[in-house]
């Protein structure tokens, strides 16, 4: 990857923590510092403007890792600039950062801050060609970004997005629920504070949609049950919103069905890239599966 792109890891800031144990302590309300990976395709003409994609990773707690390597190669081949934020709660940065998690909350603003950082620091990025895409937890962050900042994104893709935290708490294990009700996180269960879980759920914010959006889900998803995403789709339709979606039937790969390296996964990703390209107009769009295959091993 490094041969075909400039890669950097930068440090930036988001809002102060939501939960502050000692509000009067020195620096207690300082902005949260977090990292983000920056990927700039080599050989692009820096005298011209280029589109930006924001790519938040999944979770609950995770980080941006090599699972996204082929997706990055495919985005690089299209000459997208990419920023991948390691928003609060990401792993690999110690217990304190882990416990800053704010699922469906301030992590959304960290991601938005990474978008703004790119526009402020790289003058070859076109502010009118900015998109966002993510899967699972990253899909939830994608949805909240376009709901809260609709004028700042021209297009979005949400793959198997976590959509309804209340429903999700009903079918997940107690250990999973404990991640949310922990004192350092939400501090209450969905039963104890329904409104707080609604606030963090895209399905209850569907009325805010203004940005062109594509949603994909899979009926055999073992992580984000398809009924969560169906609830989101129904909510968007009830609000008479314009968007695109596809519910895939039992595609191998389950939750990761369009992120693995199978032929079907590549076909689905090609649809995603075509959706993004309609609004971002990259220099070298992927128009076929052949283009996508070549992105894995040939410079474009």
Name what the model sees in each region.
Residues 2-128, 133-135, 170, 256:
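Cap/lid segment of the alpha/beta-hydrolase catalytic domain
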Residues 16, 22, 87-300:
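Active-site-proximal cap/loop segments of hydrolase catalytic domains
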């Amino acid at each position: 990857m490094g041969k075909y792109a400039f890669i950097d890891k930068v440090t930036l800031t988001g809002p102060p923590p939501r939960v502050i144990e000692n509000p009067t302590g020195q620096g207690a309300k300082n902005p949260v510092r977090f990292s983000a990976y920056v990927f700039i395709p080599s050989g692009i003409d820096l005298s011209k403007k280029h589109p930006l994609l924001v790519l938040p990773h999944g979770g609950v707690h995770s980080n941006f890792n090599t699972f996204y390597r082929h997706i990055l190669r495919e985005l690089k081949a299209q000459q997208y600039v990419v920023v991948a934020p390691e928003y609060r709660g990401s792993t690999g940065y110690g217990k304190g950062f882990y416990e800053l998690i704010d699922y469906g909350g301030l992590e959304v603003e960290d991601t938005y801050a990474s978008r703004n950082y790119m526009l402020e620091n790289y003058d070859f990025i076109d502010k009118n060609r900015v998109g966002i895409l993510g899967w699972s937890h990253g899909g939830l962050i994608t949805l909240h970004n376009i709901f809260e900042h609709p004028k700042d994104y021209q297009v979005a893709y949400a793959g198997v997005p976590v959509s309804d935290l209340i429903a999700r708490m009903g079918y997940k294990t107690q250990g999973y629920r404990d991640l949310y009700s922990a004192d350092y996180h939400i501090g209450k269960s969905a039963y104890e504070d329904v409104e707080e879980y609604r606030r963090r759920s895209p399905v209850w914010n569907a009325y805010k949609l203004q940005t062109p959006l594509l949603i994909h889900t899979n009926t055999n998803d073992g992580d984000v049950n398809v009924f969560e995403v169906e609830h989101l789709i129904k909510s968007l339709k009830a609000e008479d919103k314009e968007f695109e979606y596809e519910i895939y039937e039992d595609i191998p790969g389950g939750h990761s069905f369009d992120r693995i390296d199978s032929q079907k996964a590549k076909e689905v990703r090609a649809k995603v890239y075509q959706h993004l390209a309609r609004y971002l107009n990259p220099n070298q769009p992927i128009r076929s599966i052949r283009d996508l295959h070549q992105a894995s091993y040939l410079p474009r």
